[in-house]
Amino acid sequence: MKKLNNPAILVVDMLNDFVTGALACDRGKAIVPAMAQLLDAAREKGVPVIFCNDAHIAGVDRELALWGDHALAGTKGAEVIPELNVSSKDFIVPKRRYSGFFQTDLDILLRELGVQSVVMTGLHTHMCVRHTSADA
């Protein structure tokens, strides 16, 4: 297997509201143990772990009209699930749209960390993971 150059792990929307809450995804629960192992291994090797998460503004974000209230900034639903053990060395990038790159600090963070390869994981691959991948 080819070695990745300056990798980072990018975790998209592994939030309480998407795993067990307002927009729960039963299949999402199944990937949690393997994802937790991946993140622990990355941290042990010094690979940056970045969480890119929905953080909507109630009554403002248009997406809420489509999907209902979910991942409202500052609520428990917008927090990363506890099983992924967010570390003080991890990075959290809030987003208000499907793409983690649209009007966020994700691009500059990756550049400043010197990241050249990104391993993506997360929930709703047909939505936020897909849009973030396309914009990368």
Residue ranges of each PLM-predicted region?
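Hydrophobic residues within alpha-helices
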Residues: M35-L38, L106, T132
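Phosphate/ribose-phosphate-bearing ligand recognition and processing surfaces
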Residues: L123-V129
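Active-site environment of divalent metal-dependent phosphoester hydrolases
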Residues: A58-G59, G100-F101, M127
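Short Gly/Thr/Asp-enriched flexible loops that form oxyanion-binding sites at enzyme active sites
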Residues: V129-A136
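Active-site acidic carboxylates
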Residues: M1-F91
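Internal catalytic-core helix/loop-beta-alpha segment
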Residues: I81-L123
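Basic side chains
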Residues: R43, K95-R97, R130
